[in-house]
Curated annotation (Swiss-Prot):
Shows particularly broad specificity; although bonds involving phenylalanine and leucine are preferred, many others are also cleaved to some extent. This is Pepsin A-4. The lineage of its organism: Eukaryota, Metazoa, Chordata, Craniata, Vertebrata. SUPFAM superfamilies: Acid proteases (SSF50630). Glycans are attached at N88. Disulfide bonds join C107-C112, C268-C272, C311-C344. It comes from Macaca fuscata fuscata. GO terms for cellular component: extracellular exosome. Each pepsinogen is converted to corresponding pepsin at pH 2.0 in part as a result of the release of a 47 AA activation segment and in part as a result of stepwise proteolytic cleavage via an intermediate form(s).
């Protein structure tokens, strides 16, 4: 009987995984476009995806340079609860950053008016700090304070979690954002205030059985996407997972062997670095090879600054193949051409980031929708397999 009990406990310990459903909504770009505000927004805000990954040096006032314009195209969001009783927030689960922040009742900016606001006085488990935080973007900063509370994520009660409470959010555009805040899932080394990231705090408390999480992004317009904390669900992918070592432990950065089209190398001829980022919708790379790719697929810029493609051309376009750790990962045109409301746009975006390793690419949702992705902190590796 004791052996049966022990086996039962072992089985339970191997099953401590939690799934957080993600909902696909209209992006901030789409909301601004529908309100006739996109062109004006793009004129006033210089979009620079690179600034998310290589910010300016952090100052003693805990300034985190992560431009929120970089979430312009993000479409996948999940719900978390903060406090006791829980106050719910819609957040971006972002493997390209490490901090958690949400709007608070102390924020009177227009951007906060139509979002859920955290009220510390309504939580019996909230613990204040004297630390402040500032996230700089565009023409101003989101400023706020840091506090501790219980964060509920997919059934997990993550106690004593540090997070940011916004007090000011400049600019009108965040008013139209389909999310309240950001939940970062990258390494603690890039946490702006030295704050322990959510997943690290979860693992430190052994609230999950494995030091990893995985992501499935559905192409479905609304449901089916999920973040899995503490495990892997093989029903979301076909074949076996191929493992890729993390090359730099900060972002989820890996090495790419080459990028080809029709058997011809079009980029990354001598290898390059890439960041796997759920918080970036598009697939970005250096401006020169991206410009060549845009030309090859027949993309041209419209008045809103979008790279549009003829929808009728999709069936004749070739796959673009990323070879990673010796394994080929093809992206069909149905993946890298984004179709919405009868129009088609390119899923590629130019971005120049000088690094010691050379050119840098960002494998955003365009890539992750095709490949179930495991972020393995225990072994510092990323697992990839074709989605089921």
């Amino acid at each position: 009987m004791k052996w049966l009990l022990l086996l039962g406990l072992v089985a339970l310990s191997e099953c401590i995984i939690y799934k957080v459903p993600l909902v696909r909504k209209k992006s901030l770009r789409r909301n601004l476009s529908e309100h006739g505000l996109l062109k004006d927004f793009l004129k006033k805000h210089n979009l620079n995806p690179a600034s998310k990954y290589f910010p300016q040096a952090e100052a003693p006032t805990l300034i985190d340079e992560q431009p929120l314009e970089n979430y312009l195209d993000v479409e996948y969001f999940g719900t978390i609860g903060i406090g006791t009783p829980a106050q719910n927030f819609t957040v971006v689960f972002d493997t390209g950053s490490s901090n958690l922040w949400v709007p608070s009742v102390y924020c009177y900016s227009l951007a906060c008016m139509d979002h859920n606001l955290f009220n510390p006085q309504d939580s019996s488990t909230y613990r204040a700090t004297s630390k402040t935080v500032s996230i700089t973007y565009g023409t101003g900063s989101m400023t706020g304070i840091l506090g501790y509370d219980t964060v509920k994520v997919g059934g997990i009660s993550d106690t004593n979690q540090i997070f940011g409470l916004s007090e000011t959010e400049p600019g009108f555009f965040l008013y139209f954002a389909p999310f309240d805040g950001i939940l970062g899932l990258a390494y603690p080394s890039i946490s702006s205030s030295g704050a322990t990231p959510v997943f690290d705090n979860i693992w430190n408390q052994r609230l999950v059985s494995q030091d990893l999480f995985s992501v499935y992004l559905s192409a479905d317009d609304q449901s089916g996407s999920v973040v899995i904390f503490g495990g892997i669900d093989s029903s979301y992918y076909t074949g076996s997972l191929n493992w890729v070592p993390v090359s730099v432990e900060g972002y989820w950065q890996i090495s790419v062997d080459s990028i080809t089209m029709n058997g011809k190398t079009i980029a990354c001829a001598k290898g390059c670095q890439a960041i796997v980022d759920t918080g970036t919708s598009l697939l970005t790379g250096p401006t020169s090879p991206i410009a060549n790719i845009q030309s090859d697929i027949g993309a041209s810029e419209n008045s809103d600054g979008e790279m549009v493609v003829s929808c009728s051309a999709i069936s004749s376009l070739p796959d673009i193949v990323f070879t990673i750790n010796g394994v080929q990962y093809p992206l069909p045109p149905s993946a890298y051409i984004l179709q919405s409301q009868g129009s088609c746009t390119s899923g590629f975006q130019g971005m120049d980031v000088p690094t010691e390793s050379g050119e840098l690419w960002i494998l955003g949702d365009v890539f992750i929708r095709q490949y179930f992705t495991v972020f393995d902190r225990a072994n510092n590796q990323v697992g990839l397999a074709p989605v089921a």
